[in-house]
């Protein structure tokens, strides 16, 4: 590992943006101005130097920052990706694994929307070893005695803050989430991963980034998968999208672009 200059980045296939300084008492969206000022200081120069690869963004608030990375770079929507709800989805799978005592690798479940407080768990489309999760709950009532899905969802949302309150940062989980995205790009895995992707009609929305499952390959976001949502999930996703739109307007007021 060594330091280098902007010009050397022109040869890279992927650039990971990970600047951030979240404190214990801060919400992710409260980081917005500082994060946008940070990306404005280098993204245009990186593109000017000849970088023609894919940006992967970790920086919070990741959905909003990823939107402005695309605006600053002028790249196509598929070549700017955020980690989004990737880590949150992994946490949901871990929690469901603990409840059911089944390997998380055979559990398919996603958190959708904002990587933040308004994200929602897509229980209605989740599966355990191919069995619809809600059906599995009905046939295994002993495992879910006293378990409320709303509490599990809130547990996912609170996990990051519990970690930050304990050691003042998070690094291993988000590092693994980011490496999965980069690996899928490098090896053209066409793997379905939850990430922050640009909506262009999917789920009935357009013009911003939010957390959804997508096929990731050598071109970045190859395709966004539209999962069925029940009424509660649809309303929650709508609320999360409203937050995205609101803070994009806040970001624009900073005259970043």
Explain the meaning of each model-derived region:
Residues 24, 64, 164-166:
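Short, solvent-exposed loop/turn segments at secondary-structure junctions
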Residues 73-79, 88-257:
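C-terminal substrate-binding/catalytic lobe of Rossmann-fold NAD(P)-dependent dehydrogenases
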